[in-house]
């Protein structure tokens, strides 16, 4: 996936009110960007980091500029726009870049499922194969090349794991897919130190037949694509 039109560069001054960030452009202009990430963004929003942003042609938007990527002061690229996790995963499935999810003839998005009536990110179907339910999570929290999810306690994420376990119990295929959107991450684990319950449920889910996949994106200011499978340690 290529960014079109190209992203523009600025330097982060501060992120605040969760959805806003002030930056300064190379020519000295101060802008306020929309921040499409409600998480803690630990390590992704340090003042002085390089920010790459897009600009909408919708003149009615109060904040037409959107923060897409962070380029940290150590050089790592991080996709902070959480919407890209699903877009990149869909693209990779359709391109059959994810070997574990290849060979299906139909892909549906936002399908209602489960006892708690959640919406699954993707459902894959093919003749003579069980349906495949895929829940996608964006991973940007990193420490010493170790990627973690979540970056804050997530009751919603816990619910999704319970739903996937119920799907697996019914004989369907259930997959939790971690889209790693941080160029410095080389391996993945649940963030037990942040959300112990989520880590416990993820281990239980694996024992009950839920598949756990982690794929890392190649990220630059020009574009992104999910390419590489990463090891997962529970």
Swiss-Prot record:
The keyword DNA-binding applies. Pfam families: SfsA, SfsA_N. InterPro entries: SfsA, SfsA_C, SfsA_N. Keywords: DNA-binding. GO terms for biological process: positive regulation of biosynthetic process. Binds to DNA non-specifically. Could be a regulatory factor involved in maltose metabolism. Belongs to the SfsA family. This is Sugar fermentation stimulation protein A. It comes from Escherichia coli (strain K12). The lineage of its organism: Bacteria, Pseudomonadati, Pseudomonadota, Gammaproteobacteria, Enterobacterales. The gene is sfsA.
């Amino acid at each position: 996936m290529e960014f079109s039109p190209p992203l523009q560069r600025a330097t982060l001054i501060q992120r605040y009110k969760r959805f806003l960030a002030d930056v300064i452009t190379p020519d000295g202009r101060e802008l306020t960007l929309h921040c499409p990430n409600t998480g803690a963004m630990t390590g992704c929003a340090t003042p002085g980091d390089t920010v790459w942003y897009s600009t909408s042609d919708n003149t009615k938007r109060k904040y037409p500029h959107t923060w897409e990527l962070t380029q940290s002061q150590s050089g790592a690229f991080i996709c902070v726009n959480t919407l890209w996790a699903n877009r990149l995963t869909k693209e990779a499935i359709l391109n059959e870049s994810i070997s574990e999810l290849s060979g299906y003839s139909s892909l549906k998005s936002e399908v209602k499922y489960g006892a708690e009536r959640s919406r699954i990110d993707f459902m894959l179907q093919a003749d003579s194969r069980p349906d495949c339910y895929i829940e996608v999570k964006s991973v940007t929290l990193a420490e010493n090349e170790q990627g973690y999810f979540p970056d804050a306690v997530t009751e919603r994420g816990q619910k999704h794991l319970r739903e996937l376990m119920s799907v697996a119990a019914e004989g369907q295929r259930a997959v939790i897919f971690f889209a790693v959107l941080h160029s410095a991450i080389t391996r993945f684990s649940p963030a037990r130190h942040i959300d112990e319950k989520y880590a416990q449920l993820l281990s239980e889910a694996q024992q009950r037949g839920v598949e756990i996949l982690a794929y890392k994106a190649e990220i630059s200011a020009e574009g992104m694509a999910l390419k590489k499978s990463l090891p997962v340690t529970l």
